[in-house]
């Protein structure tokens, strides 16, 4: 059975940890930054025996797959701290934005594989997507192991490292775009007389259903949109207002800006 270590249990690391422990199998070693955070983690996961809160050296020595979820500025110090404890054949997966494969390979000892990854927070509920970019010497078996470890958190997609910026814009940061849209819809629903709870239930399920339609049918978004849009109807009128306000252009600009920052 695979042992997975998670270094850093903030927003992203915590989401991955929750996804793994709620839906997966195997031992999970959680490494917190401070003793206070470690105590908090022990209390939070007291009912999940698969989770053990340990220090970084212990996690490095025991784990097969190492998920590095600390802030980008802290990656180099963490890897320097654990490199002498990492076992040959183990895999280090960095979730830190902007930390390149070259940086990882340089920081790791020979025989330890490096993978750059970008997950997203829906991993917490098993509906995430993690984009993986393996170093050249990562074996098919090691990459498959990483995919199996992350499977409880959602899907995985393997892309070359040069596409990590675009992937971040379309996946890593994308939940925030949808939350903003739903937030605006809920506010508008309240203005139309709905309670906030009812507006959130309606808009949230619409977002969930639309996402499922895209993934499960494999059809283009434009085709699915057309199926909902009757000529001269209320949906067509609403979409015309969105186009008039430049929503399509704003989204394209947001994605490009995010990709530039993340690349």
Segments (PLM) and residue ranges:
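Active-site capping/gating segments
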Residues: 31, 116-131
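Hydrophobic/aromatic beta-strand patches that form the interior of the parallel beta-sheet core
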Residues: 29-31, 93, 115-117, 157
């Amino acid at each position: 059975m695979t042992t997975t270590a998670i270094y850093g249990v903030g927003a992203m690391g915590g989401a991955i940890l929750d996804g793994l422990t709620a839906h997966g199998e195997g031992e999970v070693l959680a490494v917190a930054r401070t003793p206070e955070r470690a105590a908090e983690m022990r209390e939070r996961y007291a009912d999940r025996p698969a989770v053990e809160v340990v220090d970084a050296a212990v996690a490095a020595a025991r784990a097969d797959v190492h998920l590095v979820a600390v802030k980008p500025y802290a990656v180099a110090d963490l890897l320097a701290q654990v490199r002498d404890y990492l076992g040959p054949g183990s895999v280090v997966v960095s979730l830190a934005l902007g930390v390149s494969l070259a940086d990882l390979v340089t920081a790791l000892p020979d025989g330890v594989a490096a993978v750059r990854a970008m997950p997203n927070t829906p991993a917490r509920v098993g509906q995430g997507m993690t984009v993986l970019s393996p170093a050249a010497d990562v074996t098919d078996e090691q990459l498959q192991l990483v995919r199996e470890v992350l499977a409880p958190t959602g899907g995985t997609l393997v892309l070359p490292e040069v596409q990590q910026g675009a992937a971040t814009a379309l996946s890593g940061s994308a939940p925030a775009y949808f939350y903003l849209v739903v937030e605006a819809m809920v506010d508008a629903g309240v203005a139309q007389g709905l309670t906030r709870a009812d507006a959130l239930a309606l808009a949230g399920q619409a977002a969930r259903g639309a996402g499922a339609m895209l993934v499960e049918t494999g059809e283009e978004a434009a085709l699915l949109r057309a199926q909902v849009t009757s000529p001269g109807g209320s949906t067509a009128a609403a979409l015309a207002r969105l186009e008039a306000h430049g929503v399509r252009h704003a989204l394209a600009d947001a994605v490009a800006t995010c990709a530039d920052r993340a690349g």
